[in-house]
Amino acid sequence: DDDWVKATLLTSNGKDARKAKAEIRLKGDWADQLRDSHKLSFRIKVRNNDKIFGMSKFSIQAPKTRGNHNEPLFLDMMRMMDVIAPRYFFVDVRINDMKIGIMALEEHFNKILIESQGGREGPIIAIDEDWIWRQRHLNIIDGTSGLPYEYRDYPIKVFKAGKFSPGTIRTQHNMRAMSLLRDFMDGIVPANEVFDADKTSRWWIISNIWHAL
């Protein structure tokens, strides 16, 4: 997160053109996002409370890193079944007038994503996979395999947590969400006390359908 550089974004749909100030950095946890030096993966933040394609933060990556057309079709089905999912589509990219070609644009997790699909702003949490990627890199170096810890050992992260202020409603909601997920991972509370059973079942079914293809 310390590697951001300033940039200017120019977008066009063939009729109208837009310009916006932004910050950009390399992204990717795995070699497939950095292997092709011509199609590097980038995380992009639009500055000055502006938006591009209705988004304030998104990524671009080579389509093959996400299974080409599989990912947008998978996410489209999620939204059709009323499961919140990031917007994802293909764009023709140039960097400093150098033609990069078709890249996949993926919306980042924030309140704009939630509210654009009828949800209310609230905590967005996830299991932090940083340990997994670090261990996989070590496995490649050492010629080993597997992970030396269990699923319940992983830390939990909050997207855009902001400054920690104990008295604020936002901090209390973040802590409550993290506590519920941690209690589930530790086997203290059942899934139906943490997750929306109907939406979680739809997410599980769709994920298994597409990951089996």
Predicted regions mapped to residue ranges:
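ATP-dependent phospho-/nucleotidyl transfer catalytic cores
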Residues: N110-H211
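Sec-exported extracytoplasmic/periplasmic mature domains
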Residues: M77-V83, D186, I209-L213
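Mature N-terminal segment immediately following signal peptide/propeptide cleavage
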Residues: D1
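Conserved ATP-binding subdomain of kinase catalytic cores across diverse folds
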Residues: W4-Y154
